Amino acid sequence: MKHLLLLRLVLPKPNYILRRSFLFHSGKTTPSPLDPYDTLQRRVARSGDPSASIIKVLDGWLDQGNLVKTSELHSIIKMLRKFSRFSHALQISDWMSEHRVHEISEGDVAIRLDLIAKVGGLGEAEKFFETIPMERRNYHLYGALLNCYASKKVLHKAEQVFQEMKELGFLKGCLPYNVMLNLYVRTGKYTMVEKLLREMEDETVKPDIFTVNTRLHAYSVVSDVEGMEKFLMRCEADQGLHLDWRTYADTANGYIKAGLTEKALEMLRKSEQMVNAQKRKHAYEVLMSFYGAAGKKEEVYRLWSLYKELDGFYNTGYISVISALLKMDDIEEVEKIMEEWEAGHSLFDIRIPHLLITGYCKKGMMEKAEEVVNILVQKWRVEDTSTWERLALGYKMAGKMEKAVEKWKRAIEVSKPGWRPHQVVLMSCVDYLEGQRDMEGLRKILRLLSERGHISYDQLLYDMNGAGLSWKIVDAMGKGRYVEEREVRI
């Protein structure tokens, strides 16, 4: 995919409007009926098949003589990103650049960088970043690159970008600090969390509610209840900080992890009381998950009923309630929710069937998991790497390694650039094939991985040594040039 950079930094232009007739022909077109509910954004929202081109929807809209505003495209990209439809969002971003009547702002370029990383991988995002002139690499662009590395937990590169931002004077606010704080928590670097917080104090960078909630989350991860409680008391006493529902939800999560259910429920109730109308949808999604972790099914269903009464009923709600029920190992209730989703929800979201597949796999119900996969492939025409990898892991947990190898091979065959194989599945399959003396099967797996650029010979040796497995068989294959030698990815 070509990612065209159009940094036409000129005087501000109006919010451009485009008709297909202006681009491709001069004949008259018949505008679509004046249906207020038939908008381009609604058409895009209904076209949820990730394997289909979203540009066809846009072309169809233009062919009917309709208008396309730059602001509308921005709204559509925002919506697609919100629902993790990154490939479709990138297609529209590319389309905006290719049709020069649409002004491309520096913010658009930063969003493009983020989308390229999500769709094509960090390597493609880095190439795109290098095409941008030095004088145009602003705070937003560096911030987007920092987010790309942080989201993939590439710590050393994120730290490099953070240092560059510091040298360029881009650390005036707390946002970059929050990104790094969150990354340190996710990578278990808790001493760096304290160090960075002290740096914020030294540089007089005022923390915000996200800073507070990230620190509370760090306490909950390590089950430091005493530290969490003391920190919360200090925050409550700080008149300059306005705590929100998430503050008490994160505190509740800390209590849940420590097994202090009653204290957790007290915090969850306090969190609910602080939810305002604008945040209600997202808050209920989070709180359902926490109530599920606390084993309170009746509270999950209470919030689910409230959630369904809200305007704008989204797939994220189904994801939250299904996740909550799975935490309580209630697969029968999950199946009922799935039936409700299939019957009344038209927007396809692969994350929802993926949750059911995972639930079946954890319970060893592999036939049912296969049924869901067959529906995805046959009805929705969707073959996703993650789908097959979930099946492979399920068969591995069930001790059916022959089936695990079969499903994982299919995952590799449908994989896209940027995919990183699940190490547990990878090493289990290699170990199994080695134990079976299946040299040909092992060669095919390694060849597929190498051809698609997912793993190198050196990386495979590194992973195998870390897992305590034999490396001689892979070493022999490396010498036979079945896999390409590359730098080890750690």
Swiss-Prot record:
Gene3D superfamilies reported in the protein's UniProt record: Tetratricopeptide repeat domain (1.25.40.10)
Transit peptide: 1-86
Key words of the record: Mitochondrion, Repeat, Transit peptide
Molecular function as annotated in GO: mRNA binding
GO cellular component terms given for this protein: mitochondrion
Entry keyword Transit peptide: yes
Record localization: Mitochondrion
UniProt cross-references to SUPFAM superfamilies, sorted A to Z: TPR-like
Signal sequence residues: none
Chain positions of PPR repeats: 138-172, 173-207, 208-243, 244-274, 280-310, 314-344, 349-379, 384-421
Family, per entry: Belongs to the PPR family. P subfamily.
Protein name according to UniProt: Pentatricopeptide repeat-containing protein At2g20710, mitochondrial
Originating species: Arabidopsis thaliana (Mouse-ear cress)
Native organism taxonomy: Eukaryota, Viridiplantae, Streptophyta, Embryophyta, Tracheophyta
